Amino acid sequence: MSESENTEKRWGVAHVHASFNNTLITVTDLTGAETIVKSSGGAVVKQNRDEASPYAAMQMAESVAEDIKAAGIDGLHVRVRGPGGNGNKSPGPGAQATIRALARAGLEIGRIEDVTPIPHDGTRAPKNSRL
C-alpha cells in the first residue's frame, strides 16, 4: 500500500450564511471551535448591492478554497443557513454559487445540510394594518 493511499483526509466545516443582503463564509474545524478562514461579500465587491450576488459568492469561495488548501484541508461539510426566524426561510442567491465554486475548486464536499433557524412558535408574525 502506498503512502498516498494510507493518508487520511482532513475535513473542515463551511458555514455559509446566505441572506438577501450579504453572504458570509466561515470555515472551521470539525468541532467548530477554531476558525480557519472567513470571508464576506463586502470583502470582494465594491457595491453594497452586489454583496449577496452569486458572483461575489463565487469570488469568496475561490479565495477561501485557496486558503483552506494551504491549511491542509481536503474536504468540507457545508452547513447552509438562510435568514430564518420570522423572515424568509429560503437561503439567498449566494448559497448555491458558493457550493458550486467550492466543488469546482477541487475540494471534496461531504454533507450539505440546511441549518436555517425555524421558530417553534416564537414571536407574533407581523400582520397587515386594516383601517
From Swiss-Prot:
The keyword RNA-binding applies. GO terms for molecular function: rRNA binding; structural constituent of ribosome. This is Small ribosomal subunit protein uS11. GO terms for cellular component: ribonucleoprotein complex; ribosome. PANTHER family: 40S RIBOSOMAL PROTEIN S14/30S RIBOSOMAL PROTEIN S11. Located on the platform of the 30S subunit. Belongs to the universal ribosomal protein uS11 family. InterPro entries: Ribosomal_uS11 (IPR001971), Ribosomal_uS11_archaeal (IPR019961), Ribosomal_uS11_CS (IPR018102), Ribosomal_uS11_sf (IPR036967). It comes from the Archaea. Part of the 30S ribosomal subunit. It comes from Haloquadratum walsbyi (strain DSM 16790 / HBSQ001). It holds the Pfam family Ribosomal_S11. One of its GO terms (biological process) is translation. Keywords: Ribonucleoprotein, Ribosomal protein, RNA-binding, rRNA-binding. NCBIfam families: arch_S11P (TIGR03628), PRK09607.1 (NF007176).
